[in-house]
């Protein structure tokens, strides 16, 4: 199951999650948290509409009653109320694998947009996660570090987030760190591993973070170890970026079919 928002272009959010699940051979269900559209007449600004909390709770109840879930991925929540609704449901469900993509802002938004959800996410969702996949900005927020400039900083951030949450961490450096490679750091309390792939450009690609967390979720559901899941997810996303889709949007979108195309 993914608990995430719908992004109208299909490049990120719940649609990216479901496409990733299908590409990796698992069945996905969806509890929708919000609907994100853009304003093409105003620099593609975000238009976010939350799903009513009772409607969200009804979706979560339906899915948890219908299936014995192997893994749950949590994506865009968007508000303290939504975080509370989802956290309450996850406490009751207690999934074996709960993968948290700690989305604080949508791509293109300013960091200040995260302030009203930051503390709620840390207090209510992070303690429930078994695996967390923060990007550069989210790693700063969750670790309490003032800056992450290189791989050593990213390692420290991953260790801090694990120490505070107990979750396995895959901290994403992506294109934010200098150098020829897109570097992520895996840490589970004992194993520290740097996952690296050559960069494809220097600009973030929409859907990469969503697809990475969804790929981890899919692989865990299939029985992979956390490290195996992280390695496969890294390869999946790297292939999707190599086969990314251009459009009239101010950013490209990852294509989930890239992994199979390169197989």
Task: Please identify what each model-predicted range represents.
Residues 3-9, 193-206:
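Short pre-catalytic strand/loop immediately N-terminal to key active-site residues, enriched for Gly-Thr
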């Amino acid at each position: 199951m993914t608990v995430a928002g719908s992004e109208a272009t299909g490049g990120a959010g719940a649609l990216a999650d479901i496409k990733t699940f299908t590409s990796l051979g698992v069945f996905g269900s969806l509890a929708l948290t919000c609907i994100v559209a853009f304003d093409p007449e105003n620099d593609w600004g975000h238009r976010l509409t939350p799903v009513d909390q009772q409607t969200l709770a009804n979706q979560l109840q339906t899915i948890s009653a219908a299936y014995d879930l192997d893994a749950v991925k949590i994506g865009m929540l968007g508000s303290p109320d939504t975080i509370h609704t989802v956290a309450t449901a996850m406490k009751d469900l207690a999934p074996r694998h709960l993968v948290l993509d700690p989305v604080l802002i949508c791509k293109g938004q300013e960091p200040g947009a995260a302030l009203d959800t930051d503390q709620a996410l840390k207090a209510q969702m992070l303690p429930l996660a078994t695996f967390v996949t923060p990007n550069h900005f989210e790693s700063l927020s969750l670790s309490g570090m003032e800056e992450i400039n290189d791989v050593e900083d990213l390692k420290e951030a991953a260790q801090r987030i694990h120490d505070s949450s107990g979750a396995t961490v895959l901290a994403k450096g992506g294109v934010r760190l200098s150098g020829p490679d897109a570097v992520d750091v895996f840490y589970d309390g004992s194993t520290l591993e740097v996952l690296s792939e050559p960069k494809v450009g220097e600009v973030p690609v929409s859907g990469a973070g969503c697809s990475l967390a969804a790929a981890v979720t899919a692989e865990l559901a299939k029985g992979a170890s956390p490290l195996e899941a992280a390695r496969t997810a890294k390869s999946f996303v790297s292939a999707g970026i190599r086969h990314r889709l251009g459009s009239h949007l101010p950013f490209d979108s990852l294509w989930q079919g890239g992994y199979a195309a390169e197989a």
